[in-house]
């Protein structure tokens, strides 16, 4: 968008321009001497800003040309922030890009999501944010004023909260922008990006992001709209492609893996099973064990309530024995297979504890599907002990994947269609600031003209007469604005109409100098937030 050269550079905007030309930023503009202004070093003692100092360097002989160049500089700097809208960005690490050792350090418990959103939105170039943290992925979704600076700030925030160096995060992270973000979250919600293709639990986790985000300031219109649309896509894909039919879940894959690793002389009905944790994942482990023929197992949990609820869902003949958490180690001493799926942020089984357990006939199996992990990595060093985590489930998943590849192709067609709808909706939001600013612009003119005209009328007008004059002026202005306003409204469904609407918006921004106001409002919001 072009910006009128007549706009006034206010202190906040001047500060932004000064920062924008600070050499510490990697996205620095072209050298100022190219346009006839000598670049001067920035320092904290001089608060008058780049533009003030540049103005002092204008020689009398080149004054006119330099002023023109200065206006170009102002305009180009503003353009950098207003020509393109804020970007939706995802900075993520998943089972496809990072090991569980890293993911568990970055994991953010659900109860901490609102705090994380608030901290992310406190960063200079972040307007909105959401966190999707599961056993297979840790992804930060943001609306960023600047792609490069937004990514830099979020990556540094991730490093600070996890203790992982920025360089290491950069080696394993993936970055996606705008349309690619839309494609990605839709694939995630549909189960296409899961280790277990088509699994349904991820859709519930995406729903939880929206549920937790409701009422959180930083979970704004763009990001919330993205996640809500992702839920719609996830439901549609599962309904129209039946991709979840026959799909294994992480829990069922864990059970399959355990049975694969049991010695030939053992099977589900004879092996002694222990399940630690009776949450969603633990409940599914129990159900899959029963489906495989296991009729007796011990379940360790903080409270008996959840275990009793699971027990009531089991068929006759299945014995589920509840044990409190403080008896976990003694229960493990009598188990051949230990499944762990709790929300604990520290390991429940450490090497020094497991070393004290009596040996079993072949090897004691620990199948840990928690992130952060419930079983310390050093436990695998103990003789007669084998440890598996979520990254080891790929062996099971590979055998189950082929028959759903075709359904995944059908799902991609749905995702492509829904992505177009979402991007069109987001494009239609672009005109909202212009509509608000144009309305505010006319309101200021109306108020100023009424105040200026009333004394000239030479009469003391009562409230009723004043309201009549006010309504008359507003009626005239509203009729004049009706046409422009109609040409700024679009639902985003028709690409041709949308393109025309955006052209109209840019024209009005140029005519009334609204770009600078819109930018200053963003800056003001950031300053007030801090």
UniProtKB/Swiss-Prot annotation:
Subcellular location, record wording: Plastid, Chloroplast
Keywords associated with the record: Chlorophyll biosynthesis, Chloroplast, NADP, Oxidoreductase, Plastid, Porphyrin biosynthesis, Transit peptide
GO MF: glutamyl-tRNA reductase activity; NADP binding
Domain of life: Eukaryota
InterPro entries: 4pyrrol_synth_GluRdtase, 4pyrrol_synth_GluRdtase_dimer, 4pyrrol_synth_GluRdtase_N, GluRdtase_CS, GluRdtase_dimer_dom_sf, GluRdtase_N_sf, NAD(P)-bd_dom_sf, Shikm_DH/Glu-tRNA_Rdtase
Major subcellular site: plastid
Top EC category: oxidoreductase
Binding sites annotated in the UniProt record for NADP(+): 277-282
Gene3D superfamilies: Glutamyl-tRNA reductase, N-terminal domain, NAD(P)-binding Rossmann-like Domain
Any GO BP annotation: response to oxidative stress
Disruption phenotype: No visible phenotype, but decreased heme content in roots.
Pfam families recorded: GlutR_dimer, GlutR_N, Shikimate_DH
Annotated GO CC locations: chloroplast; plastid
EC number(s) given by UniProt: 1.2.1.70
UniProt pathway annotation: Porphyrin-containing compound metabolism; protoporphyrin-IX biosynthesis; 5-aminolevulinate from L-glutamyl-tRNA(Glu): step 1/2; Porphyrin-containing compound metabolism; chlorophyll biosynthesis
UniProt-listed HAMAP family: Glu_tRNA_reductase
Family: Belongs to the glutamyl-tRNA reductase family.
Protein name: Glutamyl-tRNA reductase 2, chloroplastic
UniProt source species: Arabidopsis thaliana
